[in-house]
Amino acid sequence: MDFWELYDDYYARVKKFIFALVKDEWVADDLIQETFIKVQKNVHQLRDESKLSSWIFRIAYHLCQDHFRKTSQIRKREQVVSEKKELLSGPLFQMEFEQHQMSACVQDKIRLLPESYQTVLVLFDLMEFSHQEIAEILDISIENVKVRLHRARRKLKTILEEECRFEVDERSVFICQPVLKKLRDCE
């Protein structure tokens, strides 16, 4: 197997996958580089070339997991700051910006899911991997993939129902408004 062919064939998909998980271009670039360094060093150990795709994505997935372990506290702090900024931002009137905000709102809610649910949603819905491919990447059964996907969607629906109010404005733009939770009196 020629490394540069592998690189050309998989770079765009690996980049899309990693970026969907880490949501940071600089971090994604580092993880992509690490992924292909590991691929280059270990491709000779791959016994079954039919599993090449899942092997490459498993490497990328594990590197993302390592990154999340290292930065979990930082991510939690950044998420709180981001949510506070959104609540204080005021009304938005441009259609494109509202659509972007809707997407960002849903993505922020996806980040509230457990990591295993986030990963399955990204692999299936964004990356369009099959249940079989996801099972190979995550090293779990196909049935477990289906269960996680079902639970992830159900939990995301619950989060969206609890934390968002969806409306269609006068221009037929679907918008999401965060639900402001009332503060209880401390007694």
Where do the model's predicted regions map?
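DNA-recognition helix of helix-turn-helix
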Residues: 138-162
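Structural recognition of an alpha-helix C-terminal capping motif at a helix-to-coil junction
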Residues: 30-37, 50-62
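Arg/Lys-rich amphipathic alpha helix in sigma70-family domain 2
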Residues: 47, 58-79, 99
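A short, charge-rich alpha-helical start-of-domain segment used by transcription regulators
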Residues: 1-16, 32
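Sigma70-family region 2
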Residues: 36-51, 71
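Short, basic/polar amphipathic helix motif occurring as a linker/hinge flanking DNA-binding modules
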Residues: 67-89, 165-169
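Helix-turn-helix DNA-binding module
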Residues: 111, 115, 119, 127-144
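C-terminal edge and immediately downstream basic/flexible tail or linker adjoining helix-turn-helix-like DNA-binding
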Residues: 2, 154-187
